Amino acid sequence: GRSGYQNLITFDMGGTSTDVCMVTEGKAQLTQEYSIDGLPIRIPLIDIHTIGAGGGSVIWVDDGGMLRIGPQSSGADPGPACYGRGGQLPTLTDAHLIRNTVRPEAFLGGRMEIFSDRSRAALQPVAERLGMSLEDAADSAIQLANANVVRAIQLISTERGFDPRDYVLVPFGGA
């Protein structure tokens, strides 16, 4: 491609999910094992692996007391609690705001006001259920999302015999 790189791992984190895909020697990896609503699709398609970890993915605790992220999403509207549009559920964006990895003054180039107090209020019940501080719960959610992304990249690379060190990561997306 125009970048001069032939081996890429694409990484698209949006509001609802993260998609990863490998491009080897300038060609996207293909699959013929795909289904939509349980119906098999038997034509060559670009092999995109999707996980439920986007900026709007909801952070929650399951019945066994384990921290989870997604697949439920707050969507763009109402969006994360920090948007101030009525969203009540804690999201990955809220966790990043609590941990200062998202700067309110720089969000959308400073064109959108976000509210850390709403993020904190939304994540507090999760922290209490886990018996953690708010900051530790936010850190744990971020670490879980990162681990899920790493696992997705492993599924498309090392588990298929490719070394991700031979590839350039190309991140893009809205989150």
Language-model segment annotations:
Residues 1-175:
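N-terminally biased helix-coil "hinge/interface" segments that flank
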